[in-house]
């Protein structure tokens, strides 16, 4: 029911990519043709078909992370837990892993992602929890967390300078201009995390001053 990719997975480097997946498949009770088909499917999903017969000691960091992601899916789990899946991976490899996570979402997997790379989290997650000093500080839908309250953004299409000069409240269509989008402008998860951390630091400093005053 659960697949897991730790931050620093350990693999037997003398095994090939295909042999590694077969090994974990057998640990999960998969055998025969079903296992062979599943290994081929996973290698295709993570883009390692051409490296299937290559030993892991010849894999790059990004390739090792992808084979790790494949092993977490070997038993077709309902929940996949990924702990820092792009740790030590170059930007290209990181983007490939991000795309893999998005593909898993599209295929119906539930992915629990733990990462310090908040930009990456913002790209792939629907719901987010922010932990600071060992406690959950904020949790909820991504769009709700990062929107900036009491501000409204408006995007216009084909708006003339004259129309822009007249905008004060309600925007009316003129010469083909149309309201494309209205809503709250967005912050980023990184800025939100920093705000939470700074707020927490101020609260601690205030509490310490009160204790000193007693």
Regions found by a protein language model. Give the residues of each.
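Short phosphate-engaging motifs
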Residues: 120, 137, 162-163, 189
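ABC transporter nucleotide-binding domains
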Residues: 1-113, 118-132, 136-138
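ATPase nucleotide-binding modules
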Residues: 155-167
């Amino acid at each position: 029911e659960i697949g897991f990719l730790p931050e620093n997975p350990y693999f037997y480097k003398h095994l090939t990519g295909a042999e590694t997946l077969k090994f974990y498949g057998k640990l999960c009770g998969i055998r025969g043709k079903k296992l062979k088909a599943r290994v081929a499917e996973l290698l295709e999903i993570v883009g390692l078909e051409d490296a299937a017969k290559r030993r892991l000691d010849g894999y790059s960091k990004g390739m090792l992370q992808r084979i790790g992601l494949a092993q977490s899916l070997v038993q077709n789990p309902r929940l996949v837990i990924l702990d820092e899946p792009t740790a030590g991976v170059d930007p290209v490899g990181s983007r490939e892993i991000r795309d893999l996570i998005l593909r898993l979402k599209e295929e119906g997997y539930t992915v629990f992602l733990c990462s310090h790379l908040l930009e990456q989290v913002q790209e792939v997650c629907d719901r987010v929890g922010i932990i600071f000093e060992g406690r959950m500080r904020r949790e909820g839908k991504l769009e709700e967390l990062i929107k900036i309250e009491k501000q409204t953004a408006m995007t216009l299409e084909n708006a003339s300078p004259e129309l822009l000069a007249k905008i004060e409240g309600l925007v009316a269509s003129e010469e083909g201009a149309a309201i494309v989008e209205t809503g709250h402008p967005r912050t980023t998860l990184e800025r939100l995390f920093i705000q939470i951390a700074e707020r927490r630091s101020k609260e601690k400093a205030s509490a310490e001053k009160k204790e000193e005053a007693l």
